[in-house]
Amino acid sequence: MPIADMLINEASGHRVITFLDGNAGYNQIFMAEEDISKTAFRCAWFIGLFEWVVMTFGLKNAGATDQRAMNLIFHDLLGVILEVYIDDIVIKSAGLGNHLADLRLNLERMRRYGLKMNPFKCAFGVSAGKFLGFIIHEKGIEIEPKRVEAMKRVEAPTCKKDLQKFLGKVNYLRRFIFNLSGKISSFTPIFRLKDEAEFTWGQNNKSHLRRLRIICLRRQYLRCLREGSLLGFMWLQKIKLLVLF
């Protein structure tokens, strides 16, 4: 499976975007003849046994199989004019003229392989849209509004499971939070408690939770120092060079 963060980065920063969503994408892949019997299921009222001739939802490798099929179909277009995550397709272009050509190339490829999209979930030639839980557009990436609203409704956890749910929501926004691991380190001792140990939520934990919520609700910006100028940087950890731009 592709790395979602990388796809989001590659899909953002373009002026014109088209979003396509597969119409029951799994069902567009035929089952191997020798594996059809493994999908047998029975119905009520003694109707009998039925078998799937197309890939159904819930199979262990269904997602990976769908992604592999899409990679084979769009192998020469991936990372160039489009990005694909299972049955979600983003066609990206610098301008409208280029986008029409890119869109035609993509649709011709889909027609050749018989791919069908859900027209109610598609958006053509727009400037912004939702992809993998984030809003992407020419200027970058934004947090989806409903995730911000979810953070507003967060209450103090009463057990380890509640805390895990909250940190799961925070981790989804990690690209917008500097030094996230350091900001959540105060919660580490709680996760080390044994199941039979009493869950204690102290004043220090409350203040850290409140501070973390404020950070998540604050709009984040990444802006170049001067428009039109080049910017280079190095990212190092101790004396080991990690990234050079």
Q: Language-model segments: what does each one mean?
A:
Residues 1-245:
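Retroelement reverse transcriptase polymerase core
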